[in-house]
Structures are given as C-alpha cells and as structure tokens.
C-alpha cells in the first residue's frame, strides 16, 4: 500500500519528497522569488559551482509570462510547478534512482513506456549548458535530465546531475485527465479540491496583467536598476544578494517579452546583459567559497 495518495497533486509532491529524502537529498523549500525555472534557485545555480558536494530536492513554482493563455488552454500555464532534484556529484546510478522515483509514484516501468530522448540543455541567461535527455512517459514529456557541464561560465567539476519533473504533466498522466484544471489537488475530509479551484482565476488575471497591463516604462527602469544594483553588490563581494537582483532583472525581461516591448535585436542584447550578471555572480560565489577553503568538502 502506498504511503501517499499519488492520485492527488499534493500526494504526488509528498511521495517525491519522501523518496528523494530517502536517497539522501536535503529537502529545500521553494525560492520566494519569480523565476522561469527551478534551475534559477541558488540551490541549483550556485551550488553547482565548485567542488563542494550537495544533493537536494525541492518544489519550485515557475513563472513564464509568455506562456499564459487566460486559463483557456488545458495544457499551458504562465505559473506552474517543477520538482527539482540536484545531485552533486552525479551518482553512477542516477538513471536507476530516477526510475525508482517513478515506481514510488505508482508508475510501472515494465508496462509503461519510458523513453530517454537526447536533448542537450542550455540556458543563455545563466551561461549554463549540459548534456541531457527528455524523458517521455507513454509519449508525453514529463522530465528533463541534465548533466551540467558549465554553470555561470564556470566548468562543473564535479558534474552535477539535475532531474526536473514537470509536476502538472506527470500528475495528468497518473490521474488520467486531459486538462490541468481537472487535476485533483487534494481529496480529504473537507472534500475534493481541483487544480482549477486553486489556480484558474489566477491564470486568467495574471495572463491579463502579463499581456495587457504590465507597465513597460517601469519594467525597463526596473531592469536597469536591478542590473546596477547587482553590479554594485558584486563589487561589495556579496554574490548571493547580487544574484537575487539578477533573478529580478530576468523576470522584468520576461514581462517585457510578454508585452512585445523588445525587438528581436534588443532581445539578444538583454539576454547578454543578464548572462554577464549571472557569470559575474557565479565567479564571485566561487571565489568566496574558495577563500573559505570550500568548507563543505569532507576530504581535505
């Protein structure tokens, strides 16, 4: 008998947290800032840099303003959830561990078709790339699997293994529904609550904001301010708050993109500006950890 009701969204999350905790991961809480992917969380981006080991898992709410569809598309959201697993150094049996996690949420890997489709990953704004695969479950992509080669322009040694589950997609498969809004979020003593009950109105209103009301002039000013603040903090040898300003600049850029306020040429220029900040934060973080003697390294 399963410990958690994986046919609910919250039960699926609890089962994944429990499984990865048993594999030795520290269960981290979500970052309290707008990010486009779980990789932006400092626990992935910064902790992948340098020799110090760290394995963690966490849920991360993600915002991608351009993906909003006013709550009318059953498969597209501007706000959704990823479950992120970061294993450093990447263990030799990482694929087996992943397949074990599928079994933990009730998926039979002998009868369900699980395919690893080569799909190398790159994040231009983070100066990061890695060798990887999309993982398809009976024809639906549910996970991205990446071995980080470089983060913030710094070579990864040791290599970090990242597993990113698309929670809504995985839940749709497990629950057998065709619309995200029909997913059962919880089914308890107070009754059944669906994903739509929790988030449909938010999708309608946030899509309206992202596409119609976000103040373009203010967003351009916000980007410039965050960029300047990040540069100042890097000079002050404060890479963590400097990186928070990078994430804020990145979200401002994403909103400008949703408002169609940036031309194709300008778009590349803004991406390069964020990338330069990311790389500066990464180098500053590495230098600071090195000055501390990489304290999380056990073998000295």
Swiss-Prot record:
- Reaction it catalyzes: tRNA(Gly) + glycine + ATP = glycyl-tRNA(Gly) + AMP + diphosphate
User: Where is it located?
Assistant: Cytoplasm
Annotated Pfam families: tRNA-synt_2e (PF02091)
Recorded superkingdom = Bacteria
**In the record, what terms sit under GO molecular function?**
ATP binding; glycine-tRNA ligase activity
Q: Which PANTHER family match?
A: GLYCINE--TRNA LIGASE, CHLOROPLASTIC_MITOCHONDRIAL 2, GLYCYL-TRNA SYNTHETASE
Which proteins does it associate with, and in what oligomeric form? Tetramer of two alpha and two beta subunits.
Query: What is the protein name stated in its UniProt record?
Result: Glycine--tRNA ligase alpha subunit
Q: Which organism is it from?
A: Pseudoalteromonas translucida (strain TAC 125)
Write the gene name: glyQ
């Amino acid at each position: 008998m399963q410990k958690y009701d994986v046919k609910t969204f919250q039960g699926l999350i609890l089962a994944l947290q429990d499984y990865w905790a048993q594999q030795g991961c520290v269960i981290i809480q979500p970052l309290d800032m707008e990010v486009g992917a779980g990789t932006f969380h400092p626990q992935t981006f910064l902790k992948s840099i340098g020799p110090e080991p760290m394995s963690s898992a966490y849920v991360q709410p993600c915002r991608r303003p351009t993906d909003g569809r006013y709550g009318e598309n059953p498969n597209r959201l501007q706000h959704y959830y990823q479950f992120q697993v970061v294993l450093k150094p990447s263990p030799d049996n990482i694929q087996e561990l992943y397949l074990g996690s599928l079994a933990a949420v009730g998926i039979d890997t002998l009868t369900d078709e699980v395919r690893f489709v080569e799909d190398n990953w790159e994040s231009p704004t983070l100066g990061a790339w890695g060798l990887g695969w999309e993982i398809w479950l009976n024809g639906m992509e549910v996970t991205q699997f990446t071995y980080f080669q470089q983060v913030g322009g710094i070579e990864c040694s040791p290599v970090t293994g990242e597993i990113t589950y698309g929670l809504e997609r995985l839940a749709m498969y497990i629950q057998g529904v065709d619309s995200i809004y029909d997913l059962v979020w919880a089914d308890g003593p107070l009754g059944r609550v669906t994903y739509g009950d929790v988030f449909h109105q938010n999708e309608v209103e946030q899509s309206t904001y992202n596409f119609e009301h976000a103040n373009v002039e203010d967003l351009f000013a916000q980007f410039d301010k965050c960029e300047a603040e990040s540069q100042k903090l890097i000079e002050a040898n404060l890479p963590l708050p400097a990186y928070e300003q990078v994430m804020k600049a990145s979200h401002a850029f994403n909103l400008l993109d949703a408002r169609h306020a940036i031309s194709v040429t300008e778009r590349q220029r803004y991406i390069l500006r964020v990338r330069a900040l990311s790389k500066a934060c990464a180098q500053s973080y590495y230098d600071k950890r090195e000055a501390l003697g990489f304290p999380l390294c056990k073998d000295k």
